[in-house]
C-alpha cells in the first residue's frame, strides 16, 4: 500500500486541518481524538509518511522509532494516565481495523478500558 498524502493525518500535520494538540516534537504529533471511545482518547502519529506499523518498522530510522515510543510515554504522562494505567493500541490494515492510512497509536485511559478483545 502506498502512502496517501491526502489522508486526514497528513493534512493535520501540514496544518490544513486543526487538531486539539497535546504534544509535538520533531518526531511526533499527539492530539485528542475527535470521536473519543473512552474518557481519554488521544492519537500519537509519527511525522514521517508511514502507512502502518509494518511500513514504519521496516523504513523508519532508529531515531524515529525511539521518538515515537518516547512520545507515547510523554503523552501518557501529560494526560495523567501513566500512573493509573492506560491502553496503547495500533490497528494495522483492513483486518486490524485501520481506518486512516497513516500510522497512529491510540491512547485510551481515564477509566477502566475493559478486555483487550471480546
PLM features: residue spans?
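HIT superfamily nucleotide-processing domains
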Residues: 1-118
Amino acid at each position: 500500500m502506498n502512502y496517501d498524502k491526502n489522508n486526514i493525518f497528513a493534512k493535520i500535520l501540514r496544518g490544513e486541518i486543526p487538531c486539539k494538540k497535546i504534544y509535538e516534537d520533531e518526531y511526533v504529533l499527539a492530539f485528542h481524538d475527535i470521536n473519543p471511545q473512552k474518557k481519554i482518547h488521544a492519537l500519537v502519529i509519527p511525522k514521517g509518511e508511514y502507512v502502518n506499523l509494518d511500513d514504519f518498522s521496516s523504513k523508519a530510522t532508529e531515531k524515529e522509532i525511539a521518538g515515537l515510543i518516547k512520545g507515547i510515554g510523554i503523552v501518557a504522562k501529560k494526560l495523567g494516565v501513566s500512573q493509573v494505567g492506560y491502553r496503547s493500541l495500533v490497528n494495522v490494515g483492513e483486518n486490524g481495523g485501520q481506518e486512516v492510512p497513516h500510522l497512529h497509536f491510540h491512547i485510551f485511559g481515564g477509566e477502566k478500558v475493559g478486555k483487550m478483545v471480546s
